[in-house]
Regions:
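An anion/pyrophosphate-binding glycine-rich loop and adjacent beta-alpha core
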Residues: 265-270, 274-388
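Beta1/beta-strand and adjacent pyrophosphate-binding region of the FAD-binding site
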Residues: 33-45
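N-terminal export signals
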Residues: 2-5, 10-27, 393
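A glycine-rich dinucleotide-binding beta-alpha-beta segment and adjacent secondary-structure elements
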Residues: 392-478
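A conserved FAD-binding loop/helix module that cradles the flavin
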Residues: 249-256, 475-499
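Conserved N-terminal/central alpha/beta ligand/cofactor-binding core
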Residues: 67-181, 185-190, 198, 310-319, ...
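Conserved beta-strand-loop-beta-strand element in the redox core of flavoprotein oxidoreductases
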Residues: 193-220
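Glycine-rich loop(s) and the adjacent beta-strand/alpha-helix scaffold that form part
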Residues: 209-210, 214-216, 222-288, 491-494
Length: 504
């Protein structure tokens, strides 16, 4: 694997310059709080819930606060897919994979911008954390292994429920059984850092309502061991993301829930947390313009379409990209099609849909019912519906089948799935694709213990930890699909353990 020697300071980009704070420490190290807990977790997605469970298991008194009216954040609406290199499931199925192989994938796709130590940690701890979700959380996984664009091996598994709720639900039940309060509509509006550098608590608004900044009753919560920041990314914050990347303005929809905004990152910055790589913002290329938010059709495009079918430019009736490419490659290619006045179409046949049924049972029927997926009895019907040139489309399918049979994609260098069959078994299925803002690769800088690093000293801020999408420096320029769940669960668990063991 290629080795990179850039320091964290060397990774600072334009986004960090925007966020450089003037550190405002409290005037007194002894502050009175309305309520005290050992560990406070801010956010209730995968990272936050994993942190809370790990801290509670370690014997800490834990509290979880969530600003929205429901738990889960983006995790609740995610596809619930976990990349696990070197898993027991892979070994049972005879698949050769390792943490080192995923490290190489993440480094390559991330353009070398991810911190090698952080990448190594999540990859090496993924299999152990996967078993923890099964045995401790009680998560049930569909053990049919699949891939996503950028992965060099089939290592991804989906919850049996088919969404992130398959993780959050069991974890919430465990936390309730342990007596951990899960408080919704509690908005963190200030982090207190003392003159000696320690973080000792937060100011919140209880009963807060989204969109009404001054709502709720002001309270303070102190901590004896640590705060875990797990408030997620800012994909729904148009003003903030546009400031970092002017291209991502109002014209771009998002897969994120409305609460994915940037104020948590600003608060961390104000007390001296280093914020890195915040201008690396990812789009999910395979989304349907016919659906709001994340939708369901993106799963068709990335499973049936990219593993077992083709993506076609409506203007040329030909393939236009490696369908199994990383998200930036695919997003740029799809936007190119759209900007030229065409439509980017994910096409699969019945074989592809049958394969998708194994990974996500029942989902195709739901997408068809929503109207975001269309079904055709023949290629001619499909071509007529989208004004494609039938002879060219038939040639595209024939060429794809020829390349598949040879085992080498000479046109786009796609890695063919071993289960893929010749494209041609009617009926045929199509979804239109239009990228939506999806994931923020930047955030607060941390070390492998998940301690948040100070912008001036590059040393841990005592009492402050972070995990999940609010952390930068792991994925680099591009995140590979299914690695967010891995990142959140591995680092969330570590953050909970680190906070529980910490003494202020």
């Amino acid at each position: 694997m290629t080795q990179f020697t850039l320091s964290r300071r060397g990774l600072l980009g334009a986004a960090s310059a925007v966020l450089l704070p003037s550190v405002a420490c409290a005037s007194t190290p002894k502050r009175k709080y309305d309520e005290i807990t050992d560990v406070l977790v801010v956010g209730s997605g995968f990272a936050g819930m994993a942190a809370a469970l790990a801290a509670a298991e370690a014997g800490a008194k834990v509290m979880v606060i969530e600003k929205m009216s429901v738990l889960g954040g983006n995790s609740a609406i995610s596809g619930g897919m976990f990349a696990v290199p070197g898993s027991s499931v892979q070994k049972e199925q005879g698949i050769d994979d390792s943490p080192e192989k995923l490290m190489a994938d993440m480094t390559r796709i991330g353009q070398g911008l991810g911190d090698p130590e952080l990448i190594r940690f999540v990859c090496e701890k993924a299999a152990e954390t996967f078993e923890w979700t099964r045995k401790t959380m009680g998560v049930e996984w569909n053990t049919h292994l699949t891939g996503k664009g950028g992965h060099s091996a089939p290592r991804c598994m989906v919850t049996k429920q088919g969404t992130g709720q398959g993780i959050l639900g069991p974890c919430a039940e465990k936390l309730k059984a342990l007596g951990v309060p899960l408080r919704t509509r509690v908005y963190m509006e200030k982090i207190f850092r003392e003159e000696d550098g320690r973080v000792t608590g937060v100011q919140v608004r209880q009963g807060w309502r989204f969109g009404k900044p001054e709502s709720g009753k002001v309270k303070t919560i102190g901590i004896t061991r640590g705060i875990v920041l797990a408030f997620g990314g800012f994909g729904a914050d148009v003003k903030y993301r546009k400031r970092l990347d002017p291209k991502l303005g109002e014209a771009f929809l998002t897969t994120n829930q409305p609460g994915a905004t940037a104020e948590g990152l600003r608060m961390a910055s104000r007390i001296g947390a280093n914020v890195i790589q915040a201008d690396w913002i990812q789009c999910l290329p395979s989304c349907s313009p016919a659906e709001k938010g994340m939708g369901m059709a993106s799963h068709f495009a990335t499973i049936a379409g990219s593993l077992f079918g083709v993506w076609v430019d409506s203007q040329t009736s030909r393939r236009f990209v490696d369908e199994f490419g990383d998200r930036k490659v695919c997003t740029d290619a799809i936007l190119g099609v759209i900007n030229r006045g065409g439509k980017a179409l994910a096409v699969a046949d019945q074989n592809g849909v049958d394969e998708m049924e194994v990974v996500r049972p029942g989902l195709v029927a739901k997408i068809l019912k929503s109207g975001a997926l269309r079904k055709f009895d023949s290629l001619k019907d499909l071509a007529d519906a989208y004004q494609l040139d039938l002879k060219t489309l038939e040639g595209t399918v024939a060429r794809y089948n020829e390349l598949l049979a040879s085992g080498k994609d000479k046109d786009f260098n796609r890695r063919f799935d071993k289960r893929a069959k010749a494209l041609g078994k009617a009926p045929f299925y199509v979804s239109e694709m239009s990228p939506k803002v999806h994931h923020c690769m930047g955030g607060v800088a941390t070390n492998v213990t998940t301690a948040v690093l100070d912008v001036e000293t590059d040393q841990p801020i005592p009492g402050l930890f972070a995990a999940g999408e609010c952390v930068g420096g792991i994925h680099g320029a591009v995140r590979i699909g299914a690695c967010a769940v891995m990142d959140c669960l591995v680092n969330g668990r570590q953050a909970g353990l680190s906070a529980a063991k910490n003494k202020l």
